[in-house]
From Swiss-Prot:
Disulfide bonds: none annotated. The keyword rRNA processing does not apply. Its main location: periplasm. InterPro entries: Bact_Solute-Bind_Prot2, LsrB, Peripla_BP_I, SBP_2_dom. The gene is lsrB. The complex is composed of two ATP-binding proteins (LsrA), two transmembrane proteins (LsrC and LsrD) and a solute-binding protein (LsrB). Keywords: Periplasm, Signal. Part of the ABC transporter complex LsrABCD involved in autoinducer 2 (AI-2) import. Binds AI-2 and delivers it to the LsrC and LsrD permeases. It is found in: Periplasm. Belongs to the bacterial solute-binding protein 2 family. Residues 1-26 form the signal peptide. This is Autoinducer 2-binding protein LsrB. GO terms for biological process: transmembrane transport.
Length: 340
């Protein structure tokens, strides 16, 4: 082999390696952040997000704090921005606590979306939303009403925290619906488990002991609902109606034993998948406007809605809400069809 030919081959090899390196660097990277890791609900959402990444050929990283805190999420957001991620999708533990970090990310060209739990709308582009507050708050009350069946009743609300965006919006709507449609229902207490399984169980048992004549616990939280069911079993209380939101895999034994007659949710795997599809569309095509539609493999078509569907006054170009197609009521008859 001549020296000239050797140099030519070496040069081509270097160029080839450089091209491969550029392609790797150019690949889209999307971060999908839950409120915390180790909870089945968020793990299922992460599975959907990573499934979408494989379908679209983009790199999706699922990671979150071990405890639900603003500081933990901010640290992750900053790390992902510094690592050059193109998009961040976060389930926010606070409506405003993440805003400085998210606004800095947007200023650096990172696409910012929320899923499950929103920030203030000016702190993100799109919110992948499981349902409007009126839809989900109404769903909670209707599930309880199907079991309470009396004009005068005592009801407790039990969920994650007094600051989390989504659950407080649902509960506000649920309480308004109770006042309007069930004026004889007394809301005796509203308590919180702070996304901790042990504390949630202790709190649920405390509610049932303090209000022995309680008719219903409404628990729109993936930790609070199974904790309420377990507390009822521990205390041998089979008279209280327990409704709320959690995943079918977590709630299956309580439904099969009859402790919980029905509960609700949405397909959180789909929610994770839709989130990544929307982020990918933004990275490839730019912003979307109200009324724009997007086809999601295995899900169907979703549409961009204005922020007003969530009760917000804020509207801007490249900003809105993508609602999931449907919500689900789980019971003994259909829970076997679901695995997440």
């Amino acid at each position: 082999m001549t020296l000239h030919r050797f140099k030519k081959i070496a040069l081509l090899s270097v160029l080839g390696i450089a091209a491969i390196s550029m392609n790797v660097q150019a690949a889209e990277r999307i971060a999908f952040i839950p409120k915390l890791v180790g909870v089945g609900f968020f793990t299922s959402g992460g599975n959907g997000a990573q499934q979408a990444g494989k379908e679209l050929g983009v790199d999706v990283t699922y990671d979150g704090p071990t405890e639900p805190s603003v500081s933990g999420q901010v640290q992750l957001i900053n790390n992902f921005v510094n690592q050059g991620y193109n998009a961040i999708i976060v389930s926010a533990v606070s409506p405003d606590g993440l805003c400085p970090a998210l606004k800095r990310a947007m200023q650096r060209g990172v696409r910012v979306l929320t899923w499950d739990s929103d920030t203030k709308p000016e702190c993100r582009s799109y919110y992948i939303n499981q349902g409007t507050p009126a839809q989900l708050g109404g769903m909670l009350v209707d599930m309880a009403a199907r079991q309470v069946n009396k004009d005068k009743a005592k009801v407790a609300f039990f969920y994650s925290s007094p600051t989390v965006t989504d659950q407080n919006q649902w509960v506000k709507e649920a309480k308004a619906k109770i006042a309007k449609e069930h004026p004889g229902w007394e809301i005796v207490t509203t308590q919180f488990g702070y996304n901790d399984a042990t504390k949630s169980l202790q709190t649920a048992e405390g509610i049932l002991k303090a209000y022995s004549d309680l008719d219903a616990i409404i628990a729109p939280d993936a930790n609070a609902l199974p904790a309420a069911a377990q507390a009822a079993e521990n205390l041998k209380n089979d008279k209280v109606a327990i409704v709320g939101f959690s995943t079918p895999n977590v709630m299956r034994p309580y439904v099969e034993r009859g402790t919980v007659k029905e509960f609700g949710l949405w397909d959180v795997v789909q929610q994770g998948k839709i989130s990544v599809y929307v982020a990918d569309a933004l990275l490839k095509k730019g912003s979307m406007k109200t009324g724009d539609k997007l086809d999601i493999q295995g899900v169907g078509q979703v549409e961009v809605s204005p922020n007003s569907v969530q009760g917000y006054d804020y509207e801007a170009d490249g900003n809105g809400i993508v609602l999931l197609p449907e919500r689900v009521i789980f019971n003994k008859e259909n829970i076997g069809k679901y695995d997440f």
